């Protein structure tokens, strides 16, 4: 049984055509490994990569890492076979591209009908039409396996003909709305990749921006990005300390039934109590993960 709160600070894409990369992923400190059959694999290598990815999922050995298989779209020559292989392999989740509507979610869900019940569906949110269907797409989770939004900023930028700037100004409204739609239906929300592989100085403020929006973590394209994502998307120490104080304060007998308290000079309401429990659970899950 999966923990109620699971860290997803870093989700590393690994080309499924590269056996050495897959083996390396078993020892990297990322929270999620995404075996990629789509963008990272050339057309002539996709069939072999599919077999390799399915074998890797079945073999396991990824430890506490969540294992996700990114497939090609149903409209491509490889999509149906990718989904059949994914259903048979039974990863933690299957990441599907270019989800534009609830109908797309339902089509992918039907294609995964033979998968284990625990296998979830993650949707790439990376097109202009998807930006205006965020709530209906998220609502499809009530009747499908849908469990996560993963942002695809590169494809979105291409469709919008938008420039990718350090502050991501063109995409800020969509990033914020994607998180809100995901949260409205209890979904995971992951930010998109940072394209500048060697510019770690620029990665950190971008992650801080994503964390401020409320993303659970970030998809990454290189192992050197993992440490920064893991640090920035973890609950800050001062927030964990305050969360513990909130839980302790509301747990005192004299505060039973009270809706609001003063905790270390700050207002703490009942809504803060539930968030405090979530932060403490997440911090504990991260501590356990990093000790394993």
Predicted regions and their residues:
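Expand to "…catalyze enediolate/carbanion chemistry for C-C bond making/breaking, isomerization
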Residues: 1-292
């Amino acid at each position: 049984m999966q923990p109620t709160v699971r860290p997803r600070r870093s989700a590393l894409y690994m080309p499924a055509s590269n056996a050495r990369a897959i083996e390396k992923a078993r020892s990297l400190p990322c929270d999620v490994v995404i075996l990629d059959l789509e963008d990272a694999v050339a057309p002539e290598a996709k069939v072999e990569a599919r077999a390799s990815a399915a074998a890797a999922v079945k073999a396991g050995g990824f430890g506490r890492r969540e294992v996700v298989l990114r497939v090609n779209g149903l409209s491509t020559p490889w999509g149906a076979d990718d989904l059949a292989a994914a259903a048979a392999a039974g990863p933690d989740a299957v990441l599907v591209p270019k989800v534009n509507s609830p109908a797309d979610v339902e089509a992918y869900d039907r294609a995964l009908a033979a998968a284990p019940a625990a296998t979830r569906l993650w949707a790439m949110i990376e097109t202009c039409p998807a930006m205006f269907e965020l709530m209906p797409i998220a609502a499809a989770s009530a009747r499908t396996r849908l469990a996560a939004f993963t942002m695809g900023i590169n494809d979105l930028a291409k469709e919008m003909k938008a420039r990718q700037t350090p502050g991501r100004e063109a995409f800020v409204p969509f990033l914020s709305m994607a998180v809100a739609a995901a949260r409205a239906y209890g979904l995971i929300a992951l930010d998109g990749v940072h394209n500048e592989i060697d510019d770690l100085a620029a990665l950190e403020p971008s992650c801080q921006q994503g964390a401020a929006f409320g993303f659970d973590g970030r998809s990454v394209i290189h192992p050197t990005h993992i440490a920064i994502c893991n640090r920035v998307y973890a609950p800050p120490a001062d927030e964990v300390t305050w969360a513990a104080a909130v839980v302790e304060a509301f747990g005192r007998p004299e505060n039973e039934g009270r809706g609001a308290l003063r905790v270390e000079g700050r207002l703490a309401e009942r809504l803060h109590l539930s968030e405090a429990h979530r932060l403490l659970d997440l911090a504990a899950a991260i501590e356990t993960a990093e000790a394993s």
